[in-house]
């Protein structure tokens, strides 16, 4: 009988586990299989004496790599880590950050239909005290980390009265509503009218959809100060972690929406939970695994994610971490993705490919750099589009259509975010994998182009927010003024 060969589908994407090889501990999977007891002994040996990391070049010569990888950061701080249990696969204490944010609210009395106006019968003091204690325990608020259970009501009329939300006064508008309540002092065109025949563009509902996004984005933001509240986590560790996450996202060829959602889920989780240093890689893997299932049509298997971690975690551990992470976040993944705002503002830019490609690179800066944590995605998209048009030399850089389709952002609103992006471009390269990704030809070598432009712009001493380059109209008021600006830029 002919022999049937079985194919191993563990590595469907033909991934290489890592460019970095540990000479002492990591061996080829095809030749050796390590038992659980031996794996624990080798892990303890790696903690006591971390192996040297070397990179083998194409010529066969090994060089010592000075780059600080994720495993090096874990080994450096692993002495402070505590053993984890099954209930907390990502480690950490008893959620001290969560106890600070989620305090039990005051008990809310539930109205009943029997209003006897003081005609109830008197009872003993002990029975009243017992009933009061029972009511207090029943009315305590459930922490938001757990799925909320539906409470029964005695009457449907009371439920309708409770669900009635009073309309806010004119002076009590929320912060997310301020862009819509401004006086429209700029010119803009209705570009959605062109898509009235296309049912996929839903032009009749697009304004309502993005109004909902603007209100939702403030609720889905992580705590901007969580890195400084964590006892072991440092900003440098998050930078290495997100850079590794970008590399895994590129290997799997996932959508940009999956990367943005994964970083948002990871930041929101660490805003309320303390994560051990040796579990950071597991958290990032579980976050991308969850985001891919939410955004992608065909998501990679969990075995591929576990394989990419270089055998550090098993598929069962990734699934267990995913369950725990979603429980803490109350299964809330309704995150207004920044790519939606970027596509919306690209309509006012005539869907220019160059502007949108540079905008995607500048937008991903906001997730790899910790300084942008807590900024609204719509603000980051508007700032990325402004800087992309400035790099390409488009005039006017910001006009009435861009103000309207960005959500009402003026240059004064974007000043802080644009300056942070510019400071990242002129600073030394910190995220290697992120820089290599956008140095490819299919991304128009955006990382190299933007950095070279930033250095020349800084040397020229020009102003990022030159009022002559922007207008509240559709075009610059005077054509001669536009020609003068172009000639001045050419001379510089």
Swiss-Prot record:
<dbReference type="InterPro" id="IPR006671">
    <property type="entry name" value="Cyclin_N"/>
</dbReference>
<dbReference type="GO" id="GO:0034399">
    <property type="term" value="C:nuclear periphery"/>
</dbReference>
<dbReference type="GO" id="GO:0140602">
    <property type="term" value="C:nucleolar peripheral inclusion body"/>
</dbReference>
<dbReference type="GO" id="GO:0030447">
    <property type="term" value="P:filamentous growth"/>
</dbReference>
<dbReference type="GO" id="GO:0005654">
    <property type="term" value="C:nucleoplasm"/>
</dbReference>
<dbReference type="InterPro" id="IPR036915">
    <property type="entry name" value="Cyclin-like_sf"/>
</dbReference>
<dbReference type="GO" id="GO:0016538">
    <property type="term" value="F:cyclin-dependent protein serine/threonine kinase regulator activity"/>
</dbReference>
<protein>
    <recommendedName>
        <fullName>G2/mitotic-specific cyclin CLB2</fullName>
    </recommendedName>
</protein>
<dbReference type="GO" id="GO:0000785">
    <property type="term" value="C:chromatin"/>
</dbReference>
<dbReference type="GO" id="GO:0005737">
    <property type="term" value="C:cytoplasm"/>
</dbReference>
<dbReference type="GO" id="GO:0007089">
    <property type="term" value="P:traversing start control point of mitotic cell cycle"/>
</dbReference>
<feature type="compositionally biased region" description="Low complexity">
    <location>
        <begin position="34"/>
        <end position="58"/>
    </location>
</feature>
<dbReference type="InterPro" id="IPR046965">
    <property type="entry name" value="Cyclin_A/B-like"/>
</dbReference>
<dbReference type="GO" id="GO:1990023">
    <property type="term" value="C:mitotic spindle midzone"/>
</dbReference>
<dbReference type="GO" id="GO:0061575">
    <property type="term" value="F:cyclin-dependent protein serine/threonine kinase activator activity"/>
</dbReference>
<dbReference type="GO" id="GO:0051301">
    <property type="term" value="P:cell division"/>
</dbReference>
<keyword id="KW-0498">Mitosis</keyword>
<comment type="similarity">
    <text>Belongs to the cyclin family. Cyclin AB subfamily.</text>
</comment>
<dbReference type="GO" id="GO:0005815">
    <property type="term" value="C:microtubule organizing center"/>
</dbReference>
<comment type="function">
    <text>2/mitotic-specific cyclin essential for the control of the cell cycle at the G2/M (mitosis) transition. G2/M cyclins accumulate steadily during G2 and are abruptly destroyed at mitosis. Degradation is necessary for the cell to exit from mitosis. Plays a role in morphogenesis by negatively regulating polarized growth. Through binding to CDC28 regulates cytokinesis, partly by phosphorylation of the actomyosin ring component IQG1. Also involved in the phosphorylation of CDC6 and CDC54.</text>
</comment>
<feature type="region of interest" description="Disordered">
    <location>
        <begin position="1"/>
        <end position="176"/>
    </location>
</feature>
<dbReference type="GO" id="GO:0071958">
    <property type="term" value="C:new mitotic spindle pole body"/>
</dbReference>
<feature type="compositionally biased region" description="Polar residues">
    <location>
        <begin position="23"/>
        <end position="33"/>
    </location>
</feature>
<dbReference type="GO" id="GO:0075297">
    <property type="term" value="P:negative regulation of ascospore formation"/>
</dbReference>
<keyword id="KW-0132">Cell division</keyword>
<dbReference type="GO" id="GO:0140429">
    <property type="term" value="P:positive regulation of mitotic sister chromatid biorientation"/>
</dbReference>
<dbReference type="GO" id="GO:0005634">
    <property type="term" value="C:nucleus"/>
</dbReference>
<keyword id="KW-0195">Cyclin</keyword>
<dbReference type="GO" id="GO:0071957">
    <property type="term" value="C:old mitotic spindle pole body"/>
</dbReference>
<feature type="compositionally biased region" description="Polar residues">
    <location>
        <begin position="59"/>
        <end position="83"/>
    </location>
</feature>
<dbReference type="InterPro" id="IPR013763">
    <property type="entry name" value="Cyclin-like_dom"/>
</dbReference>
<dbReference type="GO" id="GO:0005730">
    <property type="term" value="C:nucleolus"/>
</dbReference>
<dbReference type="GO" id="GO:0000082">
    <property type="term" value="P:G1/S transition of mitotic cell cycle"/>
</dbReference>
<dbReference type="GO" id="GO:0000307">
    <property type="term" value="C:cyclin-dependent protein kinase holoenzyme complex"/>
</dbReference>
<dbReference type="InterPro" id="IPR039361">
    <property type="entry name" value="Cyclin"/>
</dbReference>
<dbReference type="GO" id="GO:0007346">
    <property type="term" value="P:regulation of mitotic cell cycle"/>
</dbReference>
<dbReference type="Pfam" id="PF00134">
    <property type="entry name" value="Cyclin_N"/>
</dbReference>
<feature type="domain" description="Cyclin N-terminal">
    <location>
        <begin position="208"/>
        <end position="334"/>
    </location>
</feature>
<dbReference type="GO" id="GO:0010971">
    <property type="term" value="P:positive regulation of G2/M transition of mitotic cell cycle"/>
</dbReference>
<dbReference type="Pfam" id="PF02984">
    <property type="entry name" value="Cyclin_C"/>
</dbReference>
<feature type="compositionally biased region" description="Low complexity">
    <location>
        <begin position="111"/>
        <end position="135"/>
    </location>
</feature>
<dbReference type="GO" id="GO:0140013">
    <property type="term" value="P:meiotic nuclear division"/>
</dbReference>
């Amino acid at each position: 009988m002919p022999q049937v060969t079985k194919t191993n589908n563990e590595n469907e994407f033909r991934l290489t586990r890592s460019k970095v090889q540990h000479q002492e501990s990591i061996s080829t999977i095809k030749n050796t299989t390590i038992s659980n007891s031996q794996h624990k002994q080798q892990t303890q040996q790696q903690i006591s004496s971390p192996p040297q990391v070397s990179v083998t070049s194409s010529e066969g010569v090994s060089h010592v790599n000075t780059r600080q990888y994720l495993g090096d950061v874990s080994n450096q701080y692993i002495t402070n880590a505590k053993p984890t249990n099954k209930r907390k696969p990502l480690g950490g204490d008893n959620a001290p950050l969560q106890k600070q944010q989620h305090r039990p609210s005051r008990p809310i009395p539930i109205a009943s239909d029997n209003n006897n106006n003081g005609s109830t019968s008197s009872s003993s003091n002990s029975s009243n005290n017992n009933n009061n204690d029972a009511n207090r325990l029943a009315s305590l608020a459930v922490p938001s980390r757990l799925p909320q259970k539906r409470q029964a009501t005695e009457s449907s009329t009371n439920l309708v009265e409770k669900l009635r939300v009073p309309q806010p006064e004119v002076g009590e508008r929320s912060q997310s509503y301020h862009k819509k309540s401004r006086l429209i002092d700029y010119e803009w065109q209705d570009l959605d009218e062109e898509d009235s025949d296309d049912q996929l563009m839903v032009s009749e509902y697009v304004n309502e959809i993005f109004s909902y996004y603007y209100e939702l984005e403030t609720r889905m933001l992580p705590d901007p100060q969580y890195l400084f509240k964590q006892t072991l986590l440092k900003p440098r560790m998050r930078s290495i972690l997100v850079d590794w996450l970008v590399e895994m996202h590129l290997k799997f060829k996932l959508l940009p929406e999956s990367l943005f959602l994964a970083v948002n889920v990871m930041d929101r989780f660490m805003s309320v939970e303390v994560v051990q240093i040796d579990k950071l890689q597991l958290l990032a893997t579980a976050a991308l695994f969850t985001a891919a299932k939410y955004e992608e049509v065909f998501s990679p298997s969990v075995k591929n994610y576990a394989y990419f971690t270089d055998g550090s975690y098993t598929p069962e551990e990734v699934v267990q971490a995913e369950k725990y992470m979603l429980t803490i976040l109350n299964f809330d993944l309704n995150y207004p993705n920044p790519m939606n705002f970027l596509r919306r503002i690209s309509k006012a830019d005539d869907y220019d490919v160059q502007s949108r490609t540079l905008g995607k690179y500048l937008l991903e800066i906001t997730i790899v750099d910790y300084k942008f944590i807590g900024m609204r995605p719509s603000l980051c998209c508007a700032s990325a589009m402004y800087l992309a048009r400035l790099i390409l030399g488009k005039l006017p850089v910001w006009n009435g259509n861009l103000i309207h389709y960005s959500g009402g952002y003026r240059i004064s609103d974007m000043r802080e975010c644009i300056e942070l992006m510019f400071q990242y471009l002129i600073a030394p390269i910190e995220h290697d994998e992120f820089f290599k990704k956008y140095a490819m030809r299919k991304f128009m070598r955006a990382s190299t182009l933007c950095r070279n432009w930033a250095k020349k712009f800084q040397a020229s001493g020009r102003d990022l927010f030159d009022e002559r380059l922007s207008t509240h109209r559709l075009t610059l008021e005077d054509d001669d003024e536009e020609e003068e600006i172009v000639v001045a830029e050419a001379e510089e």
